[in-house]
């Protein structure tokens, strides 16, 4: 995935944002996709629709939020096609808010190839802040569009899976899904002369 991350078109807590959302079944649970006119601003996976709606309203408490399946469906369908293995990637614009540091972490997460992982320390070093592994972890936890900005690819220094907002079981499933896709891509690639 090579995401186009747009710095938020709205103010703190969604001030000035017009957000539409939909909820659909995904291979990883119920999925909420929220969009502005510029892109996806929130994506969550959970078993409870009510909990996801409550989180969206809490995170964007100053936005005008409407459940509008028609407006959000194209973005949700793009994500679902990717999660079902029907497309090679999910390149949809993102309209997200974060500090300059968070945005640099999120861009680096998007650069990690499917099927690969990086430690928080490796991510910190790649963005030029080698002593900021803990801050990278906090930026990971602040990611509003989990899966699309693949924070599940970040792991502990010892290789252990670490916390994930939607639970370690979903993190394991996402990593297995991506590894399977990466393995298939390798099997289907032409043999290079050597």
Regions found by a protein language model. Give the residues of each.
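Basic nucleic-acid-binding alpha-helical/helix-turn surface characteristic of O6-alkylguanine DNA
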Residues: 1-131, 177-194
């Amino acid at each position: 995935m090579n995401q186009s991350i747009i710095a938020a078109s709205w103010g703190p807590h969604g001030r000035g944002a017009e957000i539409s959302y939909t909820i659909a079944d995904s291979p990883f649970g119920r999925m909420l996709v929220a969009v502005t006119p510029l892109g996806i601003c929130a994506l969550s996976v959970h078993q409870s629709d009510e909990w996801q709606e409550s989180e969206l309203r809490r995170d964007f408490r100053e936005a005008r939020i409407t459940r509008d399946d028609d407006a959000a469906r194209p973005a949700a369908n793009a994500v679902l096609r990717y999660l079902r293995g029907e497309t090679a990637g999910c390149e949809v614009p993102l309209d997200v808010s974060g500090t300059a540091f968070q945005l640099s972490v999120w861009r680096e997460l998007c650069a990690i190839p499917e099927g690969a992982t990086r430690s928080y320390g490796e991510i910190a070093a790649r963005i030029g802040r080698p002593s900021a592994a803990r801050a990278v972890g906090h930026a990971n936890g602040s990611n509003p569009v989990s899966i699309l900005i693949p924070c599940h690819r970040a792991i502990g220094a010892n290789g252990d899976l670490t916390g994930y907002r939607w639970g370690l079981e979903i993190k394991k499933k996402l990593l297995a899904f991506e590894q399977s896709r990466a393995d298939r891509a390798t099997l289907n690639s032409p043999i290079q002369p050597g």
